[in-house]
Amino acid sequence: MQRERTYIAIDLKSFYASVECVERGLDPLNTNLVVADVTRTEKTICLAVSPSLKAYGIAGRARLFEVVERIHELNDNRKYNSTDHQLHGKSIYHNELEAHKNWAIDYIAAPPHMARYIDYSTKIYGIYLKYIAPEDIHIYSIDEVFMDVTDYLKSYRMTAHQLAIKMIRDVLKNTGITATAGIGTNLYLCKVAMDIVAKHANTDTDGVRIAELNEMTYRRKLWNHRPLTDFWRIGRGTARKLETFGIDTMGKLARFSLHHSPLLYKMFGVNAEFLIDHAWGYESCLMKDIKAYRPRNHSLCSGQVLQHPYTFRQGLVVAQEMADMLALSLVEKRKMTDHITLAVGYDRTSLDNPIVQKRYMGPTTKDRFGRIVPKTAHGSYPLTQYTSSGRLIMDAISNLYEDIVNPLLKVRRITIVASHVIDETLAKHQNETPIQLNLFENNEEKRRDALQERHQLARERKLQEATLDIKRRFGKNSLLRGLNFDEGATGRDRNNQIGGHHA
């Protein structure tokens, strides 16, 4: 019989906001701070909100205008409740605001520094490695990890709770950042213990929350928990489908699965297995399974949300820039692709114009707020061979864009995917297909064209490698195309970003 395993999940608390506080010499648990690029519109999403601001009812991924409105509302209430209906100061510190109810709530809006967050995350991972071997750690995101600690508890003579506390306090001592942890008998249980149960647990003096679950305590504590979207892997779409059967808790899902599992498989396919297992608190995946996993198919993806609605031509410029960057990324990774996909999302206001509304005959859908919006344009383009050529990939994207994008509408989101990505050595072997001759065609001309194309691709490849070398040595903006200076181009700005935010 397999021994029961013990897993720990650790989530760094309001990570980006905590890093910004630490860099300013401030206490992350006592400082009102949001990480947001105020140079963008107030609709920009806050990447992080400090715990003290969350205590005022501000969501962790609120939009900036929601923060502004909530703080304004809170300050109006403070002003009204003040003895003279006036505010006599302001502060960004939670303890001062608690002591002075007639002060205005203030906050810092810190621009994101993605390279800095990566540095902190790397340092914290190094601290985890003092206690746990890399083969027993899975990095889930920049601020979250899973650990299989089963084989460490006996040698450390600690419980999982004690080990979690020790690691978190080591991180706090060396970085100033605290964390929340979940402990479970499988990967799913430690995750939901951290995400749901720990949020309602009492904090210690360092702001640390730790919760533990096994299959039975999971059923007692969380079978009646709402909403379902709080649970790992259940999004709004899945929750809506389950609600059609009157299922709004994990307990109801577990009971439903006893007699109606074929219906769940019909609705969700293979994902029904995860839903049913998780409803009962089961998870068969082990750390060794994660480490051994190798995807069958590989792809490279690039996407961006434009800062304002773009015209058809401006959107084409951005799509071409992205195609060029994708090709360079393939060259850098020594990969090639034979299939390109383009998805273009339209701006919500595209149909506000009565003339456009009258002329537009394309498909529509509803956004999450129930508003009628044009349906995202989507198309694929099979290439004639495996390639990393910027010329061929840009041509493919340009053709796709012209074919699928409606010039009447404003563009807001662009995503490009290179599918069937394989190593270039294998790709070159796949490309070595003989030229098929035809008695009724000029075969010599066909040979000559194929040879000329090979020379052009070889010449372009040398140029791409030289471009990458220059960019590595002197910065990404040291060598640019004329395209990058066209109206609407975003490439130069994105070269100074990581993940769409300032580095």
Predicted regions and their residues:
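Basic, low-complexity intrinsically disordered segments
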Residues: 1-503
